[in-house]
C-alpha cells in the first residue's frame, strides 16, 4: 500500500483528493492536515466522505509526515509547499504539489507573478512538471512533482500536437478559456457568491493571469521556440469545468484529425472526438478526461481546437493521482476510471 498524506485538506482540490484516494485500492490515507480544523473529523466538514474515511484533521508536522508517509500531496495556496518540501525530500518522502510553487523553472519569473521570493529555488530544476502526456518517464523517477494548473492543462493538451510538429505560427496563439467558480477555490469571495456569479458571465485578469507564464513555458518546451500567447480567462456560472477555445494559424498543410488521433491514441485520459464534434463540459464532470475536437472553418488557415476538462480532476486532483500512480509503479489509470456525471 502507498501511504499518503494531504497537506491542506479543506479546499476543493483537497476534498477531491480525499474522495479519489479513499476509493484507490492501493492507497492508505494516513494524515490530512488543516491548521484551522485540527481535531475535527473529516466527515463533519465533508459529509460525502462519511462511511469512507474515519480520520480527523491534524496539524501539519513535516517530521511526522515524513516518518509516516511514502508521498505527501500539497493542496495548499502558493507559498506553503516550498517552505515544507525540503524537509520531506530530505527524509526521502516523495511530494506532489498541486500549488504553483514549483511549476515555473525560473525563480525570477515566479517572484514577478507571485510577489515574493521563492523559498526553495534550488529545487526548481529538480521538480518535474506533472503533465503525463509529455513527461511520463520523468514522472516515474521523480521525487518532486509540480502538478499543472487547471487552465494550463486544458490549453497545453489542445495546442501540443500543432506545436510539437511546428505546424502553426507560434507568435499568433490565442486561448479563450472559461472556468466554473470552483476554480477560484473555497475561500469566501464576493465575485463567486451565488448572487454575483449566477446568471453572469465575465472575463477577468485580461492584463495577465498567473497561469500565463506556466502555459507559455510549456508551449515553448513543446515548440522548441519562443511563443506569443493571448490568454483570456472567463468566469462562467457553473460549479466545475473548463472549456478552452484555442486559435492558431496553420503554416503547413496537414490532416488535423489524423494528427491529433495519432498523438493521443496511447493516452488514457485524452479523448479526440470525431470530426465536427463540440465537446461539452458535462462530458468530463467528475472524471479525469480531457476531450478535444479540432476544426478548420471554411478550410482556411485558422485552426480551432476545443478542449474541455474538469478543473478539479484532470485540472488538479485526478492528475495528481495519475502522477502518483506513475511514481509508484501502479497502472496509470488506477482509481481514476470514473464515468462523468450527467446530469
Curated annotation (Swiss-Prot):
The species this protein was found in: Nitrosococcus oceani (strain ATCC 19707 / BCRC 17464 / JCM 30415 / NCIMB 11848 / C-107)
Compartments in which it is found: Cytoplasm
Disulfide pattern: none
One of the record's GO molecular function terms: NAD binding
Pfam families: Semialdhyde_dh, Semialdhyde_dhC_1
Pathway(s): Amino-acid biosynthesis; L-arginine biosynthesis; N(2)-acetyl-L-ornithine from L-glutamate: step 3/4
Active site residues per record: 150
Record's keyword terms, sorted: Amino-acid biosynthesis, Arginine biosynthesis, Cytoplasm, NADP, Oxidoreductase
GO CC term (a single one): cytoplasm
InterPro entries in UniProt: AGPR_AS, AGPR_type-1, NAD(P)-bd_dom_sf, NAGSA_dehydrogenase, Semialdehyde_DH_NAD-bd
Role: Catalyzes the NADPH-dependent reduction of N-acetyl-5-glutamyl phosphate to yield N-acetyl-L-glutamate 5-semialdehyde.
Highest taxon listed in the record's lineage: Bacteria
Major localisation: cytoplasm
Protein name from the UniProt record: N-acetyl-gamma-glutamyl-phosphate reductase
Protein's UniProt keywords contain NADP: yes
EC numbers for this chain: 1.2.1.38
Reaction(s) catalysed (UniProt annotation): N-acetyl-L-glutamate 5-semialdehyde + phosphate + NADP(+) = N-acetyl-L-glutamyl 5-phosphate + NADPH + H(+)
Gene Ontology BP annotations: L-arginine biosynthetic process
CDD domains: AGPR_1_C (cd23934), AGPR_1_N (cd17895)
Record family assignment: Belongs to the NAGSA dehydrogenase family. Type 1 subfamily.
Amino acid at each position: 500500500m502507498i501511504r499518503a498524506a494531504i497537506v491542506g485538506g479543506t479546499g476543493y482540490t483537497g476534498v477531491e483528493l480525499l474522495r479519489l484516494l479513499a476509493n484507490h485500492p492501493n492507497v492508505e490515507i494516513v494524515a490530512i492536515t488543516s491548521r484551522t480544523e485540527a481535531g475535527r473529523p473529516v466527515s463533519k466538514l465533508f459529509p460525502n466522505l462519511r462511511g469512507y474515511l474515519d480520520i480527523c484533521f491534524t496539524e501539519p508536522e513535516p517530521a511526522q509526515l515524513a516518518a509516516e508517509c511514502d508521498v505527501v500531496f500539497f493542496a495548499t495556496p502558493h507559498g506553503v509547499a516550498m517552505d515544507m518540501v525540503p524537509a520531506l525530500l530530505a527524509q526521502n518522502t516523495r511530494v506532489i504539489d498541486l500549488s504553483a510553487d514549483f511549476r515555473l523553472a525560473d525563480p525570477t519569473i515566479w517572484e514577478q507573478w507571485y510577489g515574493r521570493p521563492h523559498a526553495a529555488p534550488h529545487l526548481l530544476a529538480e521538480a518535474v512538471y506533472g503533465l503525463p502526456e509529455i513527461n511520463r518517464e520523468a514522472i516515474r523517477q521523480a521525487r518532486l512533482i509540480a502538478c499543472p494548473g487547471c487552465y494550463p492543462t486544458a490549453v497545453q493538451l489542445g495546442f501540443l500536437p500543432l506545436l510539437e510538429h511546428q505546424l502553426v505560427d507560434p507568435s499568433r496563439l490565442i486561448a479563450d478559456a472559461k472556468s466554473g467558480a470552483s476554480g477560484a477555490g473555497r475561500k469566501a469571495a464576493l465575485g463567486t457568491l451565488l448572487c454575483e456569479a449566477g446568471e453572469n458571465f465575465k472575463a477577468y485578469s485580461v492584463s495577465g493571469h498567473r497561469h500565463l507564464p506556466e502555459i507559455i513555458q510549456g508551449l515553448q518546451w513543446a515548440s522548441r521556440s519562443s511563443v506569443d500567447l493571448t490568454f483570456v480567462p472567463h468566469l462562467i456560472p457553473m460549479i466545475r469545468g473548463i472549456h478552452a477555445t484555442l486559435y492558431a494559424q496553420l503554416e503547413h498543410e496537414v490532416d488535423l484529425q489524423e494528427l491529433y488521433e495519432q498523438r493521443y491514441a496511447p493516452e488514457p485520459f485524452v479523448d479526440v472526438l470525431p470530426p465536427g464534434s463540440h465537446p461539452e463540459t458535462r462530458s468530463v464532470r467528475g472524471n479525469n478526461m480531457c476531450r478535444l475536437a479540432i476544426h478548420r472553418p471554411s478550410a482556411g488557415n485558422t485552426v480551432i481546437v476545443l478542449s474541455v476538462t474538469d478543473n478539479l480532476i484532470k485540472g488538479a486532483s485526478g492528475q495528481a493521482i495519475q502522477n502518483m500512480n506513475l511514481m509508484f509503479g501502479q497502472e496509470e489509470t488506477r482509481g481514476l476510471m470514473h464515468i462523468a456525471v450527467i446530469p
